Amino acid sequence: MTIGLEHYLAVAAILFVTGIFGIFVNRKNVIVILMSIELMLLAVNINMVAFSTHLGDLVGQVFTMFVLTVAAAEAAIGLAILVVFFRNRGTIAVEDVNVMKG
C-alpha cells in the first residue's frame, strides 16, 4: 500500500479542523489561538506540498518553504509582543487585549 494524495489531504484536513476547533473552544487564551492558527497554516502547507508532489512540480514546495519561513518569523514576533504585553498588564487574556490604547 502506498501513501497517495488522498492520505495527505486527509491528514491536512484533520489538522485544519483541529486548528479551527482549538480557536472556537478556547477563545480566552491568546497563545492557544496563535498555536491553532499556526496549525491551520501547517495544514495548508501540507496541501501545497502534496499537490506539488502529485503534479510533479517543485514550485509548490519552494513556495511552502518561503511560507514556513514567514510563519516562523510572525510567530516569533507575536510571542514577543505577548511577552511584553504580559509584563505590562500581568495577563494575556483576549478580553484584556481589546482594551489596549496606543
From Swiss-Prot:
Sorted UniProt keywords: Membrane, NAD, Quinone, Translocase, Transmembrane, Transmembrane helix, Transport, Ubiquinone
UniProt KW Transmembrane keyword: yes
Gene: nuoK
Origin superkingdom: Bacteria
GO CC term (a single one): plasma membrane-derived chromatophore membrane
Subcellular location: Cellular chromatophore membrane
The protein's name: NADH-quinone oxidoreductase subunit K
E.C. numbers: 7.1.1.-
Function: NDH-1 shuttles electrons from NADH, via FMN and iron-sulfur (Fe-S) centers, to quinones in the respiratory chain. The immediate electron acceptor for the enzyme in this species is believed to be ubiquinone. Couples the redox reaction to proton translocation (for every two electrons transferred, four hydrogen ions are translocated across the cytoplasmic membrane), and thus conserves the redox energy in a proton gradient.
Top-level EC class as recorded in UniProt: translocase
One record GO biological process: ATP synthesis coupled electron transport
InterPro entries in the cross-refs: NADH_UbQ_OxRdtase_chain4L/K, NUOK/Mnh_C1-like
Keyword match Cell inner membrane: no
Entry GO MF terms: NADH:ubiquinone reductase (non-electrogenic) activity; quinone binding
Disulfide bonds: none
Membrane disposition: Multi-pass membrane protein
A family per Pfam: Oxidored_q2
PANTHER family found in the cross-reference section: NADH DEHYDROGENASE SUBUNIT 4L-RELATED, NADH-UBIQUINONE OXIDOREDUCTASE SUBUNIT ND4L
Subcellular location, principal: membrane
Gene3D superfamilies: 1.10.287.3510
Subunit structure and binding partners: NDH-1 is composed of 14 different subunits. Subunits NuoA, H, J, K, L, M, N constitute the membrane sector of the complex.
Catalysed reaction equations from the record: a quinone + NADH + 5 H(+)(in) = a quinol + NAD(+) + 4 H(+)(out)
Sequence similarity: Belongs to the complex I subunit 4L family.
Gene disruption phenotype: No functional NADH-quinone oxidoreductase complex. Cells lacking this gene have a nearly normal respiratory growth phenotype on lactate, however they are unable to perform anaerobic photosynthesis. It is suggested that in R.capsulatus this complex may function in reverse flow under physiological conditions.
Transmembrane segments: 5-25, 31-51, 66-86
